Every structure is written in C-alpha cells, then in structure tokens.
Regions:
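A specific heptad-register position in long alpha-helical coiled-coils used by two-component signaling proteins
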Residues: 21-24, 78, 107, 141, ...
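Terminal interaction helix/tail motif
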Residues: 5-12, 19, 115-155
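N-terminal helix-turn-helix DNA-binding core of bacterial DNA-binding proteins
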Residues: 27-69
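N-terminal leader segment of winged-helix/HTH proteins
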Residues: 1-39
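Regular, well-ordered alpha-helical segments
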Residues: 21, 25-28, 82, 126, ...
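Charged, amphipathic alpha-helical coiled-coil/dimerization segments
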Residues: 78-135
Length: 155
C-alpha cells in the first residue's frame, strides 16, 4: 500500500501527463476542423501566438518566448512567410535588425486560435463553481511560476 505522499505524487504525475496530452490532442483536432487544417501545424500556430497580434517583434524575442534558438525559429518563420502568415520588416535606422509581424491572414489565424482557447476554457470552467475556479487559477499560477523558475524565465 502506498503512503499518502507517494499516492499524491503518482496521481499528479499521471494527471499532468494525461492533461497535457489531451490539451494538445484537442488543439490538433480543433485545428483540423478549420480552414487552416491543410495549411498550419499546431507548432506553426504557436509561433503565430508568439509573434503576437500587436507590435512587430525581433527574432530573438520570439525565440525566447518559444524557448527555441533563433536558427530553429528562422526555419519556422521562412515557412510562415511563404504561406503568407507573417512578414519580415527591416528597420530603417539599422537594416541588420529584422522584426516579424503578422499579416492580415496571420491575424485571422490567431483570432481563430484565441477563440478556440476561449471556448475551451469556458467549457472547462462551466463545470466548476467559483471556489473551484479560484483554486484552479491558483494551481495554474503555481505551476506556471514553478516552470518559469525552473527554466529561469522572466514572466
């Protein structure tokens, strides 16, 4: 028989892995149900999220948000640029600096992705009372803080 702490750890491990995989699978399925299914992968969609809706960002900033190196990001940005989702902007004052921004097509794709997550969170939280929602938020904040500290990330 397991002691209480071992039971909790095993249960949390199983639930974290299962939940992470189910969120990714749900995202894949939802993407396949859109007009973007044949055009964008989930990883490319996450890159669009990191590029963001508003002001253009440098490759270094985007790579930092995705926790990947700039050369890996370059490959993804090249593909997204060819597909018409992002554009590169060279700065007039320093032509070496390149910023990335979403095109209208990229903003439309991002809007679909944001709507998917809004609906997902709305569905999940509809099963919770206010106390459960507060506890869920607190738990997610604690997890986010743990991983940010573990990876030495400033939020």
């Amino acid at each position: 028989m397991l002691d209480k702490e071992t039971y909790y750890l095993k249960k949390m491990k199983m639930l974290m892995l299962h939940t992470f995989n189910m969120v990714l699978k749900t995202e894949e399925v939802a993407l396949k149900e859109t007009d973007l299914a044949d055009v964008l992968s989930v990883a490319e969609m996450h890159t669009l999220v990191a590029v963001g809706r508003h002001e253009a960002k440098t490759m270094g900033t985007i790579a930092g948000e995705l926790l990947i190196n700039v050369s890996t990001l370059s490959i993804a940005i090249n593909k997204l640029e060819k597909k018409g989702f992002v554009r590169r902007i060279r700065m007039e004052d320093d032509r070496r600096v390149v910023r990335i921004e979403l095109t209208d097509k990229g903003r439309d794709a991002l809007a679909q992705h944001e709507e998917f997550y809004y609906n997902l969170v709305e569905e999940v939280s509809s099963q919770m009372d206010d106390d459960e929602k507060k506890l869920f938020i607190q738990s997610l904040e604690n997890m986010a803080r743990f991983f940010e500290e573990k990876l030495d990330i400033q939020s």
